[in-house]
Amino acid sequence: MPQTPSTRWCPTPEQLMILEEMYRSGVRTPNAAEIQQITAHLAYYGRIEGKNVFYWFQNHKARERQRLRRRLCARHQQQPSPPSSTVPPAPTAAAAGAVVQVHPAVMQLHHHHHHHHPYAAAAAAQSHHLQQQQQQQAEWPAAVDYCSTASASASATAADMAIPPCCRPLKTLELFPTKSTSGGLKEDCCSSSKSSSCSTSTN
């Protein structure tokens, strides 16, 4: 019986090395143009698709957040009162600019092998702004203390208070609840004071 070839992506060591180097240089969420450029470059080292690049960055960010959360939980358990921190506001779409921006690390990677790329002039002009923006975004997750940002509710028991919020098991919300919640959401909303957030008017 002939075996069908696996469709799963198996990155080569060169592909992994390049992706990790780009991640360390600040590329966290490449846009579509960057993903195309990265994919084209990595194709020299083996089979790869754009979705592989996209998912690699998503997974790498998720693993980094998990590691950070574990470290913060361990630190929280060692010292009972961690310093509180403020979370900076997320950048808006207007701050990012309307022009498609290419991360300097992607341009450096691309420029290294392809000297006459049409995006090179536009990306070089915007690289300084984008580099600052990526650097800020890279610093934000480290500034967030996941163990101290979640506050316990007044109805929390003493046992719940002993476990830091980041270390408690996650609660799964039912997508389609089988029990009615005190008469239903619409009744609760509209029986309370008539506020603009509860209005059910149609446009």
UniProtKB/Swiss-Prot annotation:
Q: Which SMART domains match?
A: HOX
Q: Where is this region: Disordered?
A: 73-95, 109-135, 180-203
Q: Where is the composition biased (Basic residues)?
A: 109-118
Q: Which PROSITE patterns match?
A: HOMEOBOX_2
Q: What is this protein's tissue specificity according to the annotation?
A: Expressed in leaf primordia, young leaves, floret meristems, floral organ primordia (except carpel primordium), stamens and carpels. Does not show polar expression pattern.
Q: Give me the positions annotated for DNA binding.
A: 4-68
Q: Which InterPro entries match?
A: HD (IPR001356), Homeodomain-like_sf (IPR009057), WUSCHEL-like (IPR044555)
Disulfide bridges in this chain = none
> Which stretches does UniProt call biased (Low complexity)?
119-135, 190-203
Q: Which UniProt keywords apply?
A: Developmental protein, DNA-binding, Homeobox, Nucleus, Transcription, Transcription regulation
What are the GO MF terms of this UniProt record? Answer: DNA binding; DNA-binding transcription factor activity
A Gene Ontology annotation in the biological process aspect, one of them, is: plant organ development
Q: State the compartments where it is located.
A: Nucleus
Cross-referenced Pfam families, in alphabetical order?
Homeodomain
What does this chain do?
Transcription factor which may be involved in developmental processes. Seems to act as repressor of YAB5.
Family of this protein: Belongs to the WUS homeobox family.
* Name of the protein in its database record: WUSCHEL-related homeobox 3
Q: Which organism is it from?
A: Oryza sativa subsp. japonica
